[in-house]
A protein has these predicted regions:
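Receiver (REC) domain active-site loop signature in two-component systems and cognate sites
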Residues: 70
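Acidic, metal-coordinating helix/loop segments flanking the phosphotransfer/catalytic sites
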Residues: 45-63
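Acidic catalytic/metal-coordinating carboxylates
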Residues: 47-48, 74-78
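C-terminal output helix
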Residues: 99, 115, 119-128, 174
Length: 215
C-alpha cells in the first residue's frame, strides 16, 4: 500500500490516472492491482475502507473500486461517507453476495457500475475507463467553475448587482427599475459585465450561471 507522501506525489502528475481499490479479499485485490498496473494505472490498494478514508489525496482523474461487503464497513456506507465529504469520485462496486436492493441503492446514490463476481477482465477495464473519463469531465467542469469565480471577483459592486439581475433574465428596462440606474448607465454596466466575464451573449452568461450552481 502506498504511503500518504507517495500518494500525494503521484496525484500531482497531470497524466496519472488513479484507481483506488478497496477490497478485503487478498486474492481479488491482488488480481485487480495486477490487471490495472499492466495498463499503466496508478493503483492504490486498501484492505480496509477506513485506511482509504484516512488518506488525504488531491484532486486527480480517479475511480474507486470497492467491494460491497467488508467487515468494517459496507460499500454503501463508504459511498455515503465519500459523498458527505464532497468527494464525487466515480465508484465501481464489486460483489458476489449483494442483493438487488443493495445494487439499486448504490446506483441511486450515483454508483458508476456494479460488477458481480466473478467478472471478466474486459468488464473491469471498461468500468475503469468509463470512470476515469467521467472524473476527467468532473474536474474540467470544476476548473471552469473556479475560473468563473475568479472573473466574478473582477466585477465592481454595481457590476455584480447587474450580473445577478442578468442571470435572472432581466432586460435593460427591468434592470433600470430594479436598481434606479439610468438606461445609459445600465447598458454600460451590462457591457462591462459581458466583457469582463468573457461572453458575447446572454445565453453564454446563463451557461456561466449553471457552472456556478454546480460549484
Amino acid at each position: 500500500m502506498s504511503t500518504n507522501k507517495a500518494l500525494n506525489s503521484q496525484t500531482q502528475s497531470s497524466k496519472a490516472e488513479h484507481v483506488f481499490v478497496i477490497e478485503d479479499d487478498d486474492g481479488m485485490r491482488h488480481t485487480i492491482q495486477v490487471i490495472l498496473k499492466l495498463l499503466d494505472y496508478v493503483v492504490h490498494a486498501f484492505k480496509d475502507p477506513n485506511e482509504f478514508l484516512a488518506i488525504d489525496f488531491l484532486e486527480a482523474p480517479a475511480v474507486v473500486i470497492t467491494d460491497m461487503k467488508m467487515p468494517s464497513m459496507t460499500g454503501i456506507e463508504l459511498q455515503a461517507e465519500l459523498l458527505a465529504r464532497g468527494q464525487n469520485i466515480p465508484i465501481v462496486f464489486v460483489s458476489g453476495q449483494s442483493s438487488l436492493e443493495q445494487g439499486l441503492m448504490a446506483m441511486k446514490q450515483g454508483a458508476l457500475e456494479f460488477l458481480v463476481k466473478p467478472f471478466s477482465r474486459e468488464d473491469l477495464i471498461k468500468a475503469v475507463v468509463k470512470g476515469i473519463a467521467k472524473d476527467m469531465e468532473r474536474l474540467q467542469a470544476l476548473n471552469r467553475s473556479e475560473k468563473v469565480a475568479l472573473l466574478l471577483k473582477t466585477l465592481t459592486k454595481s457590476e455584480l448587482e447587474v450580473f445577478k439581475l442578468l442571470e435572472k433574465g432581466f432586460n435593460n428596462q427591468e434592470i433600470v427599475q430594479a436598481t434606479g440606474l439610468t438606461l445609459y448607465t445600465a447598458k454600460n454596466y451590462k457591457a462591462k459585465v459581458m466583457q469582463k466575464m468573457g461572453v458575447k451573449s446572454l445565453a453564454e452568461l446563463l451557461r456561466l450561471k449553471e457552472l456556478l450552481l454546480n460549484m
